[in-house]
Structures are given as structure tokens and as C-alpha cells.
From Swiss-Prot:
It catalyses: 5-(methylsulfanyl)-D-ribulose 1-phosphate = 5-methylsulfanyl-2,3-dioxopentyl phosphate + H2O. Belongs to the aldolase class II family. MtnB subfamily. The gene is mtnB. GO terms for molecular function: methylthioribulose 1-phosphate dehydratase activity; zinc ion binding. Optimum pH is 7.5-8.5. Optimum temperature is 40 degrees Celsius. It loses most of its activity at 55 degrees Celsius. It comes from Bacillus subtilis (strain 168). One of its GO terms (cellular component) is cytoplasm. Binds 1 zinc ion per subunit. Homotetramer. The keyword Protein biosynthesis does not apply. Keywords: Amino-acid biosynthesis, Lyase, Metal-binding, Methionine biosynthesis, Zinc. This is Methylthioribulose-1-phosphate dehydratase. The lineage of its organism: Bacteria, Bacillati, Bacillota, Bacilli, Bacillales.
């Protein structure tokens, strides 16, 4: 119980920070944080909640299959909880953050046909643990089928590391790390890269004119 309460506080703090950036439009997005390893349990955002609000029903505990691990409530886990279960079952990740922003949606559409986007030489890449000069990082972009098990299977094919990110085309980004702090850092780094890239392309287009 103590572990659950501590993880709840951690996830609530992350949710608060991301909500202040308006990264949860129209109740979109979902977050989770691991509570126990054996058996695997994690807290995940409840379906349909306004994540800009803070209530005692923001999260619920689920098991390794994404099913509620506790009774006595009518909460349903986020529709995309299956993606989180794949992540925790395949890696040592401890926290997973999924947000919909204009920038990550535009990037995913611009480069969706290439199925990836690569960034190189940006200082912020160091936040992803890559310290060599002119380091580069690639984000895979997967399609966005309406059938969640199909989407989850596509997502599972792209995860192997304990921290990372995947873009879902015209949908959003899922970022993760070993801790809530690391997951948020990864998410922030990629959102910075997306914003920088789009602004640079706009300026280049204006200069060409």
C-alpha cells in the first residue's frame, strides 16, 4: 500500500506538470507508473477523465494484463492500457507517458511514410543519454489502427530499451523511462526536438521565398 501511495504521488505530479503545458486536450493522453514487479502491477490513468483536474479517481491499479487489480470501484483503465502492458512486460521501464500535441502530430504526419524521423547534433539529445559529438537519435513512427490490440502489437515491435519513445501517426507520442523523472525528461526532450524542427522548416521556407 505504501508503494502504491508513493507511486500515485509521483504520477500525479507528472500529470500536473504536463497538464500545465496543455498536453492533454479533450481528455486525451494516458500515463502509467509501475508499482510492483512480482506480480506486475501499475497505476494507469482512468478512462475519460479530464487530466487537468485532480481527483481521487485519476488512476487505478491494474495487473500484467491491464485488468483492474482491485475491486470496489467502477473505474475503467485507459483504452490504450494494452500498450503499457507490453512495455512493462518487455522492458525494465518504470513509467510511461503518452500525450497528444500539435507538434508531435504534425511531425508524425510529415515523416509517417518514412516510418521514422532522425535528429542530429542538437544539444538537447544529451537528455536522452547520448553524449558524443553530433549524436543522433531516431524515433520510429507507427500507423494508428483503430483496433487497439493491432496498435499495441505494432508498438510492441518497436520497444526493447528501458527508455525511449515511439510516435503514433496522427495520434501522439509514447515516451518511457526507468523512473517518472526519466520518462518526463525523455518526453520533454522529444517535444523540444519536434518544436525546433518544425520552426526551422518554417524559417527555411520563408528564407527561400
Amino acid at each position: 500500500m505504501a508503494a502504491k501511495q508513493e507511486r500515485w504521488r509521483e504520477l500525479a505530479e507528472v500529470k500536473r506538470e504536463l497538464a500545465e503545458r496543455d498536453w492533454f486536450p479533450a481528455t486525451s493522453g494516458n500515463l502509467s507508473i509501475k508499482v510492483t514487479d512480482e506480480p506486475l502491477t501499475f497505476l494507469v490513468t482512468a478512462s475519460g477523465k479530464d487530466k487537468r483536474k485532480e481527483t481521487v479517481e485519476d488512476f487505478l491499479l491494474v495487473d500484467q494484463n491491464g485488468e483492474p487489480a482491485e475491486s470496489g470501484h467502477s473505474l475503467k483503465p485507459s483504452a490504450e492500457t494494452l500498450l503499457h502492458t507490453h512495455l512493462y512486460n518487455k522492458t525494465n521501464a518504470g513509467c510511461c507517458l503518452h500525450v497528444h500535441t500539435v507538434n508531435n502530430n504534425v511531425i508524425s504526419e510529415l515523416y509517417g511514410d518514412q516510418k521514422k524521423i532522425t535528429f542530429k547534433g542538437q544539444e538537447i539529445i544529451k537528455a536522452l543519454g547520448l553524449w558524443e559529438e553530433n549524436a543522433e537519435v531516431t524515433v520510429p513512427i507507427i500507423e494508428n489502427p483503430a483496433h487497439i490490440p493491432t496498435l499495441a502489437a505494432l508498438f510492441a515491435e518497436e520497444i526493447s530499451e528501458d527508455s525511449g519513445a515511439v510516435l503514433i501517426r496522427n495520434h501522439g507520442i509514447t515516451a518511457w523511462g526507468k523512473t517518472a523523472f526519466e520518462a518526463k525528461r525523455v518526453l520533454e526532450a522529444y517535444e523540444f526536438l519536434f518544436s525546433y524542427h518544425l520552426k526551422l522548416k518554417t524559417l527555411e521556407h520563408q528564407l527561400v521565398k
